[in-house]
Amino acid sequence: MQVNISGQHVEVTQPLRDYVLEKLARVESHFDKITNVQVIMKVEKLQQKVEATLQIPGGEVVANAEHEDMYAAIDALADKLDRQLKKHKEKQQSLLQGAAAR
């Protein structure tokens, strides 16, 4: 999995980078076919925003999160990605089971 982390109006420090990689490792443990990840951290007024785009076979998964604290925004983003990938995985499995039943 190739990971690209960038920041707009915020310096991406090593602790922030490590925290993002730790959360992405948790996400990858649920869905191991992620090929590329683009994470963008932004600061707009008083809100910390994080956007992520995951490339997976058959498309991509996009999630956004914002919070007053960057670490909390990263946590919320990881939760959203987890939910979306679980939904995608369940959908793929149900399609395979439906095709096998025919």
Swiss-Prot record:
SUPFAM superfamilies: Ribosome binding protein Y (YfiA homologue) (SSF69754). Coiled coil: none annotated. Pfam families: Ribosomal_S30AE. GO terms for biological process: negative regulation of translational elongation. InterPro entries: HPF/YfiA_ribosome-assoc, RHF-like, RHF/RaiA. One of its GO terms (molecular function) is ribosomal small subunit binding. It comes from the Bacteria. Keywords: Translation regulation. GO terms for cellular component: cytosolic small ribosomal subunit. PANTHER family: 30S RIBOSOMAL PROTEIN. During stationary phase, promotes and stabilizes dimerization of 70S ribosomes by the ribosome modulation factor (RMF), leading to the formation of inactive 100S ribosomes. Associates exclusively with 100S ribosomes, which are dimers of 70S ribosomes. Belongs to the HPF/YfiA ribosome-associated protein family. Short HPF subfamily. This is Ribosome hibernation promoting factor. It comes from Pseudomonas putida (strain ATCC 47054 / DSM 6125 / CFBP 8728 / NCIMB 11950 / KT2440).
